[in-house]
Amino acid sequence: MTISPPEREAKKVKIVVDRNPVVTSFEKWAKPGHFSRTLAKGPTTTTWIWDLHADAHDFDSHTTDLEDISPKIFSAHFGQLGVILIWLSGMYFHGARFSNYEAWLSDPTHIKPSAQVVWPIVGQEILNGDVGGGFQGIQITSGFFQLWRASGITSELQLYSTAIGGLLLAAAMFFAGWFHYHKAAPKLEWFQNVESMMNHHLGGLLGLGSLGWAGHQIHVSLPVNKLLNAGVDPKEIPLPHEFLLNRDLMAQLYPSFAKGLTPFFTLNWAEYGDFLTFRGGLNPVTGGLWLSDTAHHHVAIAVLFLVAGHMYRTNWGIGHSMKEILEAHKGPFTGEGHKGLYEILTTSWHAQLAINLALFGSLSIVVAHHMYAMPPYPYLATDYGTQLSLFTHHMWIGGFCVVGAAAHAAIFMVRDYDPTNNYNNLLDRVIRHRDAIISHLNWVCIFLGFHSFGLYIHNDTMSALGRPQDMFSDTAIQLQPVFAQWIHKTHALAPGLTAPNALASTSPSWGGDVVAVGGKVAMMPISLGTADFLVHHIHAFTIHVTVLILLKGVLFARSSRLIPDKANLGFRFPCDGPGRGGTCQVSAWDHVFLGLFWMYNSISVVIFHFSWKMQSDVWGNVTAQGVSHITGGNFALSSNTINGWLRDFLWAQASQVIQSYGSALSAYGLIFLGAHFIWAFSLMFLFSGRGYWQELIESIVWAHNKLKVAPSIQPRALSITQGRAVGVAHYLLGGIATTWAFFLARIIAVG
């Protein structure tokens, strides 16, 4: 018999809470800055309001006790979920109360989605455009209509019911947030029981969550969509509970339902192949993924995660221990490997958050790319405005999450990292050879920058000199993306070779036939050429520069040759004195600030590339003569010069937003103008010196004193860090809103 050493013993799952730890009281709400001794005294200068905003959610600065911080974060998560559910409920309510959903459902190829009707105040009703079916409203591009159809919603009453359900759930979340902070707050020990947490999140959240969704897809979505696709009037379609209770009704659509669970228990699972399919490709009626494929996918995911939910060792002595896994993770060149990482991840929520943000951001970017190649919902692919919006939205979300990951990794380094617990493990080894990492990364950025832009500059020069035969293009000197083309080809051939059971490849974008719905292209093979090769190297360049800035911020967060005691100065500090050749803009916070601008560069190039490529090579109308694309295939011809991007993309496609005045799209014209102003306003904060403003303020205060109208709260210029924060916020807001107006006015007008 083997006796386990004590550290191998299972961590018993115990519910450990503090009863009534914090009194429920509104007193604190009446005292702004109650969390800080200095702020609670009230304002003496205008800096107070900025510090209040900067520190209100920085729980680390309120108390250093993790036992106190953890339930605060936990409780805040419930509040966050409550806010999300109220927002979601609002979306469903708009669908029920102000939308043309039922009309759209009856004719999704000709009627456009709208869920907002503007009141006739000072002529604003001009925004209510004709979206078809006799409905006037603002065309929406959020994809909710397509999502609702995919989930089997056939009436506005169902949307009302779901909206009310969302509000009830929100109330439950707000109650839980209050209860788990004021009545029964979990102890730190509970948050640190990672094996139990992994089992519950993997098995419960992802496993049972996917299983529940698969059940809904099979019992509600599939029958409803099958009837809708066959042209049955939504009002004639049975209600969801009828499909659930009446097996004969289901068996008419899916014969295997008549056999019940017999095939499941006799392991004759192929019987269920009529509703759990493995077709691949898109449904030619709707232009979306086969819903029977996505139901199959969710069943498979559920099985996978239900197994994963039993993987970690808790009350029974079987399964993995997270600490053991991490400490076993070492190779011949990695020193102590991941020893010490378990302690980091159970005591630093910043480290935990950094990893989650990095993964979540990457996932969002993966989602952006799947949404157009494999549109998951019916009639999504032919709604070009929604396709462009969803791609752009998921790219921005991904970019912000990745920068947030670097921010919290740097906060971890400054506030939570303990060098004594991390001797010669992988983290320590990375930090010790950070100079080699950063200098190599810097070299890569310089190489990529000069070479990728160099190719464009060469083309612009040759074009200006009238020497098209000397340009890099598909018709002159070719730089074909051979690896990408090979990947396309491999995936296009997969159904016959590597995926023998699939009837079609995962996406028509790899190759094959055009999928058209109602005469519009849903998806078709996307050919790659020299122009794509060029812009992909710009992507490589901008992404590497973003990583350089963010990684340098993390690796040099605690110390550098310039400022060895950086850790003592904190996460954000403006400068460290005038000596040493300049010590400003070196804090970890400043690296996040600078990284945001390069993240913005990266994402802008990606969404511009996507928008133009799709309009040029994919989106358009199918006629007897073939496919007529929106911009007629000009991407390959024009996008290989910088001048082409400026003239044939930005300028040519801005005509719709610039000329939108007096039409239903005029709001986009105003947003385009206003957002440019917000962007320009940011430059006032970014290109200015604090001393200039302080001097100006003091002369204005002098004038007020002369007139005896001086305020009791002394005005002060923004600190350097505050100015930069205001600057970057307006820069990003202005830039994103400008892009939004430009994209939507264009695609709604021509798409």
Curated annotation (Swiss-Prot):
Entry keywords, A to Z: 4Fe-4S, Chlorophyll, Chloroplast, Chromophore, Electron transport, Iron, Iron-sulfur, Magnesium, Membrane, Metal-binding, Oxidoreductase, Photosynthesis, Photosystem I, Plastid, Thylakoid, Transmembrane, Transmembrane helix, Transport
A Pfam family that the UniProt record links to this protein: PsaA_PsaB
Enzyme Commission number, as recorded: 1.97.1.12
Residues reported in the UniProt entry to bind chlorophyll a: M684, Y692
Membrane-spanning ranges: 73-96, 159-182, 198-222, 294-312, 349-372, 388-414, 436-458, 533-551, 591-612, 665-687, 725-745
Residues that hold chlorophyll a' according to the record: H676
Residues annotated to bind phylloquinone: W693
Subunit structure: The PsaA/B heterodimer binds the P700 chlorophyll special pair and subsequent electron acceptors. PSI consists of a core antenna complex that captures photons, and an electron transfer chain that converts photonic excitation into a charge separation. The eukaryotic PSI reaction center is composed of at least 11 subunits.
Family: Belongs to the PsaA/PsaB family.
Its job: PsaA and PsaB bind P700, the primary electron donor of photosystem I (PSI), as well as the electron acceptors A0, A1 and FX. PSI is a plastocyanin/cytochrome c6-ferredoxin oxidoreductase, converting photonic excitation into a charge separation, which transfers an electron from the donor P700 chlorophyll pair to the spectroscopically characterized acceptors A0, A1, FX, FA and FB in turn. Oxidized P700 is reduced on the lumenal side of the thylakoid membrane by plastocyanin or cytochrome c6.
The protein's name: Photosystem I P700 chlorophyll a apoprotein A1
Species for this entry: Nephroselmis olivacea
